[in-house]
Amino acid sequence: MPDTTSLDSIISGIETNKVLIENKIIHTLTDCRGYLKNDSLTIYIGPSNKRMKGIVGDCGGIYSWCIGNKDIILMIDPQIQGWIGLLPFSIAHQYQHAYSWTKMNLGALLAMNLMDRIVAEGKADWYAHVLYPDVKMPWDTALSDEGLQYQWSRIKAEMRSEDYYQIQGIMFGSDNYPEFTGYSVGFDLVQSALKKNAALTPEQWSNESPALILEMSEYKTQ
């Protein structure tokens, strides 16, 4: 029998917080449009389900993704404490993806190599942190400085890999890599590049190629 009791509770929690969620979305989009212009976005809200319970929990109660330059999906579990504080960050992260969707060819997920994915996620996280610097996401502290260096030494030779399952294992964690390795490395890589090039606007660096961002960073492949 499917677990409908838990799902009903999640849906009820979303309905209870409907106005709060709507207001958060409105304010966040206003913040986002102050740096990058992207109008007429549609944001879909859905309940977390049993299959997604693990990743939603690991992400603090919200798992989000972008499915085009105008569509963002938010999967929410209001039963996880602190989710509302992460909502603006999650929206801003996906907003940057939506802005970059066509320019960076984000729609071709299966054709992206590891460098594309790491830099794309790093850019989105950096943008969200520009808007909400006090918000801490799980992957912000997933790796220590030493851990970042060590994992980079392991994956830097794989930057051109287009193996989808290998990339997913690096990004989210697997038997071979700690949880959120790719996200942690991506954010630190982009952060190191943009701190050294602070004059670049969000519009400018959003449109820079992954290869150039890597070249600008303190991360070296040799």
Residue positions per predicted region:
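Short pre-active-site segment immediately N-terminal to the catalytic Zn-binding motif
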Residues: 75-91
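Pan-zinc metallopeptidase signature
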Residues: 156-222
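Inter-helical turn/loop segments and adjacent helix faces that build the functional surface
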Residues: 82, 104-114, 133-140, 196-201
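Auxiliary, metal-adjacent structural segments of Zn-dependent hydrolase domains
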Residues: 10-69
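N-terminal accessory alpha/beta regions
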Residues: 1-11
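Soluble non-cytosolic domains of exported or imported proteins
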Residues: 19-23, 85-86, 90, 114-118, ...
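Post-HExxH zinc-binding segment in Zn-dependent metallohydrolases
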Residues: 111-151, 220-222
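Active-site recognition of the HExxH zinc-binding catalytic motif
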Residues: 89-103, 121, 125
